[in-house]
């Protein structure tokens, strides 16, 4: 390797380190419990599936997407458990078969006649993200640092084993604030996530290789016991 190539590689490494540090610090303003940045990608756009209309709706969230480890060791609450919902963590703020034929990043996703479909037994539709409240069990977070307006998008990520244990060992809280196991898959150019409130989001990621990487990371986080740190 030539001196010029080595210098270029070192410069790229330093730039990546700077970006990670910057993203960590920015996320920390919104979520002080951030512990470790696990992955980030420079540009993502967000869609939400409308169960009633059977179509994707493009949301006003575009920017850096990051997935990170959170410190939940203090066993604190996000909000008091209440039968009434109040927005806090998810900010926009079964077996599911998802088909997305048009993978381009444009507003045509919200046309029900273009072959896009999400089939589910759930007939509910929500106008905004549901609340995550009660005991803070959200081991991981996903955030889009929005370039369009001041509102960021965030989503709590919890291993499915934690959700299932909550149903058994904390049934009262689960009754007041029920959570469902999350799911993730990648279809065409969307990473599709079913969140804890059974809402479905599609994330279009500009960097092609990052789509599979983000899918595999979220899948790993959901299918394994929570970790305190990653090497």
Curated annotation (Swiss-Prot):
Stretch list, region Disordered: 92-120
Comp. bias regions, Low complexity: 101-120
Protein name from the UniProt record: mRNA-decapping enzyme subunit 1
UniProt-listed Pfam families: DCP1
Cellular-component GO terms for this entry: cytoplasm; cytoplasmic side of membrane; nucleus; P-body; RNA decapping complex
A GO molecular function held by the record: enzyme activator activity
PTM entry text: Phosphorylated.
Consequence the record notes for mutating residue 47 to F: In DCP1-35; partial loss of mRNA decapping activity
Primary localisation category: cytoplasm
InterPro entries linked to this entry: Dcp1, PH-like_dom_sf
Effect on the protein upon substituting residue 70 to A: In DCP1-33; strong loss of mRNA decapping activity
Family to which this protein belongs: Belongs to the DCP1 family.
Subcellular location: Cytoplasm, P-body
Impact after mutating residue 217 to A: Strong loss of mRNA-decapping activity
Other observations noted: Present with 2880 molecules/cell in log phase SD medium.
Gene: DCP1
Quaternary structure, from the entry: Component of the decapping complex composed of DCP1 and DCP2. Interacts with mRNAs, DHH1, LSM1, LSM2, LSM3, LSM4, LSM5, LSM6, LSM7, and the cap-binding proteins PAB1 and TIF4632/eIF-4G.
Reported function: Component of the decapping complex necessary for the degradation of mRNAs, both in normal mRNA turnover and in nonsense-mediated mRNA decay. Removes the 7-methyl guanine cap structure from mRNA molecules, yielding a 5'-phosphorylated mRNA fragment and 7m-GDP. Decapping is the major pathway of mRNA degradation in yeast. It occurs through deadenylation, decapping and subsequent 5' to 3' exonucleolytic decay of the transcript body. DCP1 is activated by the DEAD-box helicase DHH1 and destabilizes the eIF-4F cap-binding complex from the mRNA.
Keywords attached to this entry: Cytoplasm, mRNA processing, Nonsense-mediated mRNA decay, Phosphoprotein, RNA-binding
Leader sequence segment: none
GO biological process, alphabetically ordered: deadenylation-dependent decapping of nuclear-transcribed mRNA; deadenylation-independent decapping of nuclear-transcribed mRNA; mRNA processing; nuclear-transcribed mRNA catabolic process, nonsense-mediated decay
CDD domains (UniProt xref): Dcp1
């Amino acid at each position: 390797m030539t001196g010029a190539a080595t210098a270029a590689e070192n410069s790229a490494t330093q730039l990546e380190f700077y970006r990670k540090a910057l993203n960590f610090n920015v996320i920390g303003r919104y979520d002080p419990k951030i512990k470790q940045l696990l992955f980030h990608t420079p540009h993502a756009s967000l869609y939400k599936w409308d169960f009633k209309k059977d179509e994707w709706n493009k949301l006003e969230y575009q920017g850096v997407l990051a997935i990170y480890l959170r410190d939940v060791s203090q066993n604190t609450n996000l909000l008091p458990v209440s039968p009434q919902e109040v927005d806090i963590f998810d900010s926009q703020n079964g077996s599911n078969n998802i088909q997305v034929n048009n993978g381009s990043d444009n507003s045509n996703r919200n046309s029900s006649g273009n072959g896009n479909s999400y089939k589910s037994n759930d007939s509910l539709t929500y106008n905004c993200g549901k609340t995550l409240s009660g005991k803070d069990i959200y081991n991981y977070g996903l955030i889009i640092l929005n370039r369009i307006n001041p509102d960021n998008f965030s989503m709590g990520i919890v291993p499915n084993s934690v959700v299932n244990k909550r149903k058994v060992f904390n049934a009262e809280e689960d009754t007041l604030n029920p959570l469902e196991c999350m799911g993730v898959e990648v279809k065409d150019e969307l990473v599709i996530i079913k969140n804890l409130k059974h809402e479905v989001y599609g994330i279009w990621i500009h960097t092609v290789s990052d789509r599979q990487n983000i899918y595999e990371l979220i899948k790993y986080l959901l299918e394994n016991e929570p970790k305190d740190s990653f090497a």
